[in-house]
């Protein structure tokens, strides 16, 4: 099961689940926790291969790394915590997974807030995802980040 952190609000039965982007971790949401916890129970996730959910290189190649597999990782945590329905907040890759989850299990998604939403991945994006997932074990994060920024960001015209 992927790593998760809970911030409880004893006066609420509603949940907000935060899903980070590629290369990130649940720590990106630290500024949002206090305000959301005033009204909701907060669930932070570290996606497979990120943050405290990182796997060993040898094991990483044996796992299926698809959007539906990652969405099922999220569902596994919700089931484990007996969360029937949640609001979701996501950024970048997180938006893809929230959408995937909403398509697979619409009854589990109360609402979606999607920042920097990615609506579909073209072939180039899919290749970059595989390359990034493979090389993150052997290259420093900053080098990978700069490479992807160079490839993804638009050129000056």
Provide a role label for each language-model segment:
Residues 90-94, 98:
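Gly/Ala-rich beta-loop-alpha elbow adjacent to hydrolase catalytic centers
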Residues 1-2:
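N-terminal cap/lid segment of alpha/beta-hydrolase-fold proteins
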Residues 30, 75, 99-103:
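Short, hydrophobic alpha-helix immediately C-terminal to the catalytic nucleophile
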Residues 99, 103-104, 109-139:
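Flexible "cap/lid" loop of the alpha/beta hydrolase fold
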Residues 34, 43-89:
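Active-site loop/oxyanion-hole signature of alpha/beta-hydrolase fold enzymes
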Residues 123-125, 141-157:
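Conserved alpha/beta-hydrolase catalytic His-Asp/Glu region
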Residues 15, 41, 84-87, 108-111:
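Structural signature of beta-strand start/N-cap positions in the alpha/beta core
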Residues 5-59:
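Conserved HGGG/HGGXW glycine-rich cap/lid loop of the alpha/beta-hydrolase fold
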């Amino acid at each position: 099961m992927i790593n998760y952190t809970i911030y409880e609000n004893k006066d609420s039965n509603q949940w907000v689940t935060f899903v980070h982007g590629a290369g990130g971790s649940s720590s990106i949401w630290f500024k949002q926790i206090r305000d959301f916890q005033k009204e909701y129970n907060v669930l932070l996730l570290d996606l497979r291969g990120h943050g405290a959910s990182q796997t060993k290189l040898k094991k990483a190649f044996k796992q299926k790394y698809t959007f539906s597999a990652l969405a099922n990782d999220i569902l596994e945590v919700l089931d484990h915590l007996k969360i029937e329905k949640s609001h979701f907040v996501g950024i970048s890759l997180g938006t893809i997974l929230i959408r995937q989850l909403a398509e697979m299990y619409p009854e589990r998604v109360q609402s979606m807030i999607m920042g920097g939403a990615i609506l579909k991945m073209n072939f180039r994006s899919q290749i970059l995802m595989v390359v990034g997932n493979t090389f993150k074990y052997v290259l420093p994060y900053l080098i990978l980040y700069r490479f992807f920024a160079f490839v993804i960001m638009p050129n000056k015209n």
